């Protein structure tokens, strides 16, 4: 995960549209150095604006800016600026298109390159420079697979001299954007590779150095149409400013970077590849910033769930799995001696608890979670005092245990606020109970007294053990017992299940031929759901 850390000294806070709005002077940590930035929080974005002159930062003597050129001739502020060495594989930058890899024969030679714009993605380039920067218009990024990249004739560091014959050598940055926008579907670029411009293409303001990228423009936006206005949907960069969309970001504390002074907060990208860390002058201000950003992110969840449902259609994630709730949690990394956590996207459907490493963008990705646990075989086993919470003295963790054929699988999660903790624990418990009512009955093969049988557990009717029917015969019921008669249940953790209904035969021993834990957990879920339905627990 690329970590760009930002530090915050809070400014005035306000409210608008029912969501928190806030602005203030902050600091941003880029390549191990802190830099002041102005941070503005809106309903759906966090905007970082450079407060340090780009001239002092990159030695050019002027400010820098950048624009991404896309979409059927449309140009809008986009992923311009320098890119750290860990930039995603889908983007060519000055760190991937090294000067020594560019043929010497084209250096400082004018070339004509014809580019056919794509319906989605447009030219697929980012540009920097302009008359106001005393620099030519330079290609600073090329998105792989899009129009410019497909020509195999354009390079990061190419100066654009003209567009369809229109001279850009004395153009401002905005004039160049407009020229590219009006160029039509077939674009003839006159370019010249400038090795001496490589440092300029690489560097920008501290804000432009923050590693935060969205997928290439041709990727479908979550739940949105291809005609959605890009300005509010995608990451943007313009005149030393970056706007980070908050939708499905993960806002947390003390995960990517140690915070002994308790004055930092972290914003993780939906793809879990990048992190921005904000730091304030004191812990109280950090908490205020955290609460405001976290609140805005939470307010966007309803829209996200609706978009995911629309994206997945009637079938849901897989066979009528309707999404009931989703969101980010911190998950304890197993096997670590210290409390180390990682982001986990947790999704609750009508029947399952799903865990993803990142927010799926394409429909197919929803069908490949890292873990899938049936709620019927899952129980909440811990929610209360413990260690490792983001706020000193406050524990916000809970654990789940699931009975599987491999044994019991446990996950320890951490919520960010008490409200989040209550919502998640309530949703999981209710999900288990609803799943019990929805599924109503499970059965499994077993051996009882050396006879092949079938154990059936029904939500309403309790337990029954029947013989496996022989050809031409009906199954015979050996044991039928309601839940009220169950005195005790246990297992050996390997294959044996023990049930005691208080009858003359005493304890019943059933060989399930596999790990009994799923059945044990399902019995617990049925009992818990029935007790809750009867109002015996609050």
Swiss-Prot record:
Residues 19-298, 322-433 form the PH domain. The modification N-acetylalanine is found at residue 2. GO terms for cellular component: cytoplasm; cytoskeleton; dystrophin-associated glycoprotein complex; focal adhesion; plasma membrane; protein-containing complex; sarcolemma; synapse. It is found in: Cell membrane, Sarcolemma; Cell junction; Cytoplasm, Cytoskeleton. SMART domains: PDZ, PH. Disulfide bonds: none annotated. It is a peripheral membrane protein. GO terms for biological process: muscle contraction. The modification Phosphoserine is found at residues 87, 126, 205, 219, 232, 236, 389. Residues 518-538 are annotated as: Calmodulin-binding. Residues 112-195 form the PDZ domain. Residues 482-538 form the SU domain. Adapter protein that binds to and probably organizes the subcellular localization of a variety of membrane proteins. May link various receptors to the actin cytoskeleton and the dystrophin glycoprotein complex. Monomer and homodimer. Interacts with the other members of the syntrophin family SNTA1 and SNTB2; with the sodium channel proteins SCN4A and SCN5A. Interacts with the viral HTLV-1 TAX protein and with dystrophin protein DMD and related proteins DTNA and UTRN. Interacts with DTNB. Belongs to the syntrophin family. This is Beta-1-syntrophin. It comes from Homo sapiens (Human).
